[in-house]
């Protein structure tokens, strides 16, 4: 009986993983986005965080929607996808345009995404207090450093249910001080624990040992941005060819739980 129960349990886990795999293979994802799977490792990353399709999951600042096109369909039938995004009436033109672009994307993909919940990426909670099973942040933390990191971490903590998971990835610095897009992994762990989170562990699935982190324009010289910032105009093509071979940045992948 125990063996049978274990077998059924393994089958259910397998089916759950296959469901996420189906989303990743789906035609609604662009070939350009699928090509980045080798660097962003969405299946392994989300499985490390422990995502389930019946969860309420908040994604912070989805940006261009790379993870949104995975999370929203995956959670469509049994769970709830929540996007914490910029304000429509922000003083920043960039943020207003970002909001408009995301609302258009959600509308254009309604059949695939279902009915995502839109909340403000501001204040001391994202949506309702203790409403989320999981809050995810993909490459946002470097924008918070020195400005609002404690405010954001506190809002994440307030949003999660007890036992809820905070999963985060970002560009990893080899030093404490780095103003070129890379962030201090042990500093983040320290700050999250100070807020009240329990640190569960790290995965190296998004590590990249080829990333030397010494680029004139910072992490943005690497793919996918391939910024020309800081590069000599005469050597842009040569350097970008080099950066493409390096691939996307070296990133930490951390998991925390709200007790």
Regions found by a protein language model. Give the residues of each.
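Conserved class I S-adenosyl-L-methionine
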Residues: 53-63
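Conserved Class I S-adenosyl-L-methionine
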Residues: 179-203
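Conserved beta-strand signature within the Rossmann-like core of class I S-adenosyl-L-methionine
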Residues: 163-175
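A short acidic, Gly/Pro-enriched loop at the edge of an enzyme's catalytic core
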Residues: 125-135
């Amino acid at each position: 009986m125990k063996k049978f129960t274990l077998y059924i349990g393994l089958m259910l886990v397998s089916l759950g993983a296959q469901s996420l795999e189906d989303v990743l293979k789906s035609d609604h994802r662009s070939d350009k986005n699928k090509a980045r799977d080798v660097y962003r490792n969405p299946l392994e990353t989300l499985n490390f965080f422990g995502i389930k399709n019946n969860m309420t999951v908040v994604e912070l600042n989805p940006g261009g929607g790379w993870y949104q096109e995975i999370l929203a369909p995956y959670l469509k039938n049994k769970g709830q996808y929540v996007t914490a995004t910029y304000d429509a009436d922000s003083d920043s033109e960039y943020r207003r345009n970002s909001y408009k672009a995301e609302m258009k994307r959600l509308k254009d993909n309604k059949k695939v995404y279902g009915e995502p919940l839109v909340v403000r990426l501001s204040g001391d909670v994202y949506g309702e207090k203790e409403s989320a099973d999981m809050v995810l942040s993909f490459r946002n933390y470097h924008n918070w450093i020195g400005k609002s990191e404690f405010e954001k971490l506190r809002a994440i903590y307030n949003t999660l249910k007890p036992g809820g998971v905070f999963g985060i990835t970002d560009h990893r610095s080899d030093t404490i001080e780095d103003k070129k897009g890379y962030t201090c992994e042990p500093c983040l762990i320290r700050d999250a624990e100070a807020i009240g989170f329990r640190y569960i562990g790290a995965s190296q699935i998004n590590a990249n040992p080829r990333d030397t982190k010494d680029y004139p324009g910072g992490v943005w010289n690497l793919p996918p941005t391939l910024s020309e910032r800081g590069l000599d105009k005469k050597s842009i093509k040569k350097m970008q060819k080099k950066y493409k071979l390096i691939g996307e940045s070296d990133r930490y992948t951390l998991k925390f739980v709200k007790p």
